[in-house]
Amino acid sequence: MFISKIMDYQNLSDEQFKRRFGVYKQTYRKMVESVKSVEADSNSPSKRGPKPKLSIEEQVLVTLEYWREYRTYFHIGTSWELSESTICRIVNKTEKMLLQSGNFRLKGKKALLNQAEIPVITVMDVTETPIERPQKKQKDFFSGKRGYNTLKSQLVADQKTEEIICVFCGKGRGHDFSLFKKSRVRFHPLTTSIEDSGYQGIAAYHSNSYTPKKKSKNRKLTELEKEYNKALAKERIIIEHINRKLKIFKILSCKYRNRRRRYSLRVNLLAAIYNCELGIGIAAS
């Protein structure tokens, strides 16, 4: 049964495979190779135990299916004729190995200050993922903008290459600018950074930053200011496209049901997978 499943998926075109699992075949093969290399390094002759029911190729498919569709472990388990606890272990193990391989890691905020690779223009934005109502400290996660409990992810990307440089996650209640201050992200003086109106006041931290002009209670925007905001929005729109590409994985767009402490790991991993597709010249559509 599993062999026929793998064969069926391999017969899909590249576009069909992406629609099914959220990544292209080339990215999938790189993920499989990364997991195999980590497993080969960790295995020793003294280790004993039952053989896994799924091959590494199948385990990666299960993980991609979980991220892409975000069905429960039980429902995915019935598709693969496995228990939900086995599916849970497969997903967690695969995520851990992908990170350990080093092939799916972001550059990190230090790259923003690295003289050799500083980006010319960066775009920064915060996206939110709804979560189930917490049993304790609900106020910490309630987003006034959304009207429900959320987790926030701050993304910093290179405008030219569309590569995500770093990610920082926080609770839904905090303001976008507060999340920026907690993240301790700093830009090189020569880097131009573009943000939305949620980052008013960022000029105190980086003078080469641009945010939209806001109208006040007693003053409307001039035509020149409106044109400025329109031009800035065109430059900043790339970060919205990146958010959309990440959220084809329903684990980031649907209500997040898992432990919150694992959310940041998954956002970073999916961001690195997105970067991987850019790097091999097959940017997610």
What are these regions (language model features)?
Residues 32-43, 70, 98, 246, ...:
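Short amphipathic alpha-helical segments enriched in hydrophobics
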